[in-house]
Amino acid sequence: MYINMKDYGLTGINKTKDTRAIQRALNRGRCKPTTVYIPKGTYDICKPLTIYGNTTLLLDNETILRRCHSGPLLKNGHRFGFYRGYNGHSHIHIKGGKFDMNGVSYPYNNTAMCIGHAEDIQLIGVTIKNVVSGHAIDACGINGLYIKSCSFEGFIDYSGERFYSEAIQLDIQVPGAFPKFGTTDGTITKNVVIEDCYFGPSELPEMGSWNRAIGSHAS
């Protein structure tokens, strides 16, 4: 199934309606392989979006999804969902666009993309920016992670306690490592390729670079 978000009521005018429209399209991935295309524009997101298995999310290179809440922008599971091993929502491909955590206007510690208990996760040509204290990507318990030609721009730690935070965290499903969802069953992250990526500040003067590009807390 191919969905153009223009046909789902996406306007860039009302953040509540836009968030609902994108989530409604992503929900189609529960039933069948789905490609969701988000055209050029800036869309304010008022709650975390959940992406399901066998979904390709295509964004125009001038598309911005801008956080207007305190949580993550995108995750592949629900807080009380039962995920273990690599049996979570998998085969998720994200291509293009900008995911703006909007950390100056919403200065809350969180991670842009939280991906856990899954296989075959791909990000190509994606920009993640303006993160407060957290990670651009938290990949925990993933078998097959491919990140290519992505940009990680802009990090600040208002608390002064998260100097160690990485842009890309590769972790193991152990207690405290991945609090968003899933079981802490020791599932490792493996078969990872990260290539041709940029790590640096964003255009905002407050937003510098992460102190570490790639790392892990649990290991």
Where are these regions (language model features)?
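Flexible, charged surface loops at secondary-structure boundaries
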Residues: 26-32, 50-52, 86-88, 116
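N-terminal extracellular ligand-recognition/capping segment immediately after the signal peptide
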Residues: 9, 19, 31-73, 77-79, ...
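Short glycine-/Asp-/Thr-/Trp-enriched loop segments that recur within the blades
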Residues: 16, 159-160
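Right-handed parallel beta-helix
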Residues: 60-63, 90-101, 119-130, 143-156, ...
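Amphipathic, non-transmembrane alpha-helical secondary structure
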Residues: 23, 27-30, 148, 195
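Extracellular beta-strand solenoid repeats
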Residues: 37, 44, 50, 58, ...
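Extracellular beta-strand/beta-solenoid scaffold signature
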Residues: 22, 46, 68-85, 105-114, ...
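Right-handed parallel beta-helix/beta-solenoid
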Residues: 1-24
